[in-house]
C-alpha cells in the first residue's frame, strides 16, 4: 500500500497531481538506526501537493531490531523488498534487483534517492537501467576502511566509483565524509554536495525529568549515569565502553553504566561485564523507543565506535543538554568540538575513563558546555533546514534522461 497525501478538492486537482514530482526512496532495511529515522522523516515531508514519495525497504537482520513502525507513524506504508538484506547473496540480491526494476518501471519516478550501501548499489543500478532522470545517493557512513579484506574493499570501491558516474549527485552528511569520498576517488569534488542530517527534536524534547527510567531500572537517582546508545554491533565497539567503565570503577563508585540498544553482541557484552565483576554497576535495558525516557535519565553519553557517519545518539544527547564523550571518528569532529560542546578522546580505555572521571568530578561546572551543545545542534540540525536543502537540490538539478534498457 502506498500512502499519498490528499490535497484540497478543486477543479485543478488533476493538474496538481500531474505537476507532482515522484520520488522513490530506497533504504537497505529499516533496522534500529538513525538512518531509518532520517529516511522516515524525508518520506513524510516529501508527500504533499508538490511531491509524492514511495518508500522501499529491505528486511532487517535477526538481531538488528525493526523500525518499520516509524514511517507508519508518519502515514507512510513502505513497500518491502523481501530479498534485500544486510548480507551479500548473489541470488537474493538478483531477486531484489528484479523487484526494484519492476517497481521503477511501473512507477516511472522523476527521482530515485538511495540510502545505505546495499540500497545504494541495487537501487541505483535499477534506476540506471530504467532511465530514471535524477539519481541521488546519501552516504550515511562508508565501508572503505576497517570493515573488509583489502581485496573486497577494493572491489566495493570500484562499484561505488562506477555508480557515482551515473548518479546526479552524491550526498555526504559532513565535511569530513566528503573528504573521505574524494580521498577514495569515489567522485569528483563538484559532484559531491554536503547536506547535514536533520531531526525532529520534538521526539525527545522536553525530556522526562522525573527519572522514570532510573526508577524502573532501580538506579540510584544520585548516581551519574553514563550510557552507550545504539545498535550493539562490532562497528560500535561496545567492548571498549565496558573496559573504560571498568577503569572508572577502580576509582569512582558514584556512577552507573548502561548499554541502551540491542544487537548481535549483546550477550557477549553481558558476559564481559560479568567476567570483570562490574555487573552491579551495569544495566542492559535493551532498545527503548521513548527517547524522552532515555534522555531524562542519562547524564553522559559515550560513543566508542570504530567508524561513523554522523551518529544520531550524540546529536540527540547534545540537543538534550547531555555531556558527550566520543572517539574522533568519521564525521564526529565536524560537530563535537573538544572542550567547547563535548569531549573527544583516544580510543583506549584509560583515555576514555580519564575523561569520564573528569566529567563526573566536574559535573555541576559543565553547564556552559551542555548549553552550548544544545544551541549548536538545534540550529544546525533542524529538520526544516534538511528539507529546504534537499528541495533546493532536487529542484536546481536539471533532469537528464539516462539510457533506458527495460522500459517498453
Predicted regions mapped to residue ranges:
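Conserved acidic donor-binding segment of nucleotide-sugar-dependent glycosyltransferases
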Residues: 338-339, 343-350, 358-364
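A short, active-site helix/loop in glycosyltransferases that binds the activated sugar's phosphate group
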Residues: 166-191, 199-203
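A short, well-ordered alpha-helix in the C-terminal region of glycosyltransferases
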Residues: 358, 365-380, 389-392
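Nucleotide-activated donor-binding/catalytic signature segment of Leloir-type glycosyltransferases, i.e.
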Residues: 270-286
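N-terminal strand-loop element at the rim of the active site
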Residues: 20-21, 25-33, 37-92, 177-180
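Short hydrophobic beta-strand element within catalytic cores of glycosyltransferases
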Residues: 323-326, 336
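Aromatic "clamp/platform" in nucleotide-sugar-dependent glycosyltransferases that forms part
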Residues: 287, 306
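A conserved mid-protein helix/loop that constitutes part of the nucleotide-sugar donor-binding site
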Residues: 36-41, 224, 228-247, 264-271
